[in-house]
A protein has these predicted regions:
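Tetratricopeptide repeat
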Residues: 34, 67-70, 74, 110-117, ...
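C-terminal non-catalytic interaction modules
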Residues: 1-22, 26, 202-257
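Short coil/turn linkers that connect adjacent helices within long alpha-helical scaffolds
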Residues: 41-43, 78, 119-125, 158-166, ...
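Residue register of alpha-helical TPR repeats
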Residues: 16, 44, 48-51, 86, ...
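Residue signature of alpha-solenoid helical repeat architecture, marking inter-repeat boundaries
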Residues: 12, 47, 82-89, 126-128, ...
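Short coil/turn connectors between adjacent alpha-helices in alpha-solenoid helical repeat scaffolds
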Residues: 22-27, 53-69, 95-111, 139-149, ...
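Structural register within alpha-helical repeat arrays
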Residues: 21, 49-56, 91, 98, ...
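TPR/Sel1-like alpha-solenoid repeat signature
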Residues: 88, 128-139, 152, 169-180, ...
Length: 257
């Protein structure tokens, strides 16, 4: 089984015991423990370590200073265009997370960093699909442009399919389904959310399973919607309330008069 790193850099972990341990910790919301297993002495290790700590920020709304320090180390060690592009992609994601979660408005920094990454990572390169996905996030959630977001997500989906990046596919399926749901395309939304959930369960990506369950619940009717939401809430509690932004979506719907 390949355990793709969120940075898109060195995506196949193979049978390396350290990478297997990193994946298991990451999938259980133990990003700091996973990062501690990586010595940032090479560009690849530094990038992977930074990506873990950036992901922790997005899921927990904590650890911003540690992520910034790890990112600076990765930027200093990056030599090739792909490495510099991957570091810029992580910087864009950190700025996006800070903006989305209301920590600080860094939208301009996010756009500039992902623009730099696009100039450095060639189409078809391993990190390009992840970059396209993150540009879609900016388009959807910061620029509020669903058409641009859909185009970016589709490019990311095609790239993830070509590179057999199952984890990234779980994200592209979910976000394309979210756009379909907003447009009232229930069958398309259910299909995408179901695929995302299936992949995450197969990979053992526990921290991403509760959001996938909650998303599918939004596209289902009762009693299935409540069953899915209850299972998402169980996993959410199991992981100590992570991701933090999921809590409002797990509250039972208000009773109607």
């Amino acid at each position: 089984v390949a355990y793709p790193a969120m940075s898109g850099y060195g995506t196949a972990a193979g049978d390396d015991p350290v990478q297997t341990a990193v994946w298991r910790l990451r999938s259980r919301a133990c990003w700091a423990d996973a990062a501690a297993l990586l010595e940032p002495v090479t560009a690849g290790a530094a990038l992977q370590r930074a990506s873990l700590l950036v992901e922790r920020c997005l899921y927990t709304e904590q650890g911003w200073a540690e992520a910034e320090d790890a990112l600076r180390t990765a930027e200093a060690l990056a030599r090739s265009d792909d490495e510099r592009g991957a570091a810029a992609c992580e910087r864009g994601q950190l700025a996006y997370a800070a903006t989305l979660l209301g920590v600080r408005d860094r939208a301009d920094e996010a756009r500039a960093a992902l623009g730099r990454a696009a100039a450095l990572i060639a189409p078809g390169a391993p990190g390009r699909a992840l970059l396209d996905f993150r540009r879609g996030l900016l388009a959807e959630n910061l620029a509020h442009s669903p058409q641009a977001a859909r185009a970016a997500y589709r490019r990311a989906h095609a790239g993830a399919t070509a590179q057999d990046d199952a984890l990234l596919l779980s994200f592209t399926w979910r976000h394309l389904a979210g756009l379909a749901l907003r447009e009232g395309e229930l069958a398309e939304a259910r299909h995408g959310f179901t695929e995302s959930l299936r992949i995450r369960e197969e990979l053992g990506y526990l921290v991403g399973t509760a959001p996938a369950l909650a998303s599918l619940a939004d596209a289902e009717i009762e009693p299935e919607a409540s069953r899915l939401r209850a299972e998402a809430a169980r996993l959410f509690r199991l992981l100590g309330g992570v991701p933090t932004w999921l809590a409002p979506r797990l509250a039972p719907p208000a009773a109607t008069a």
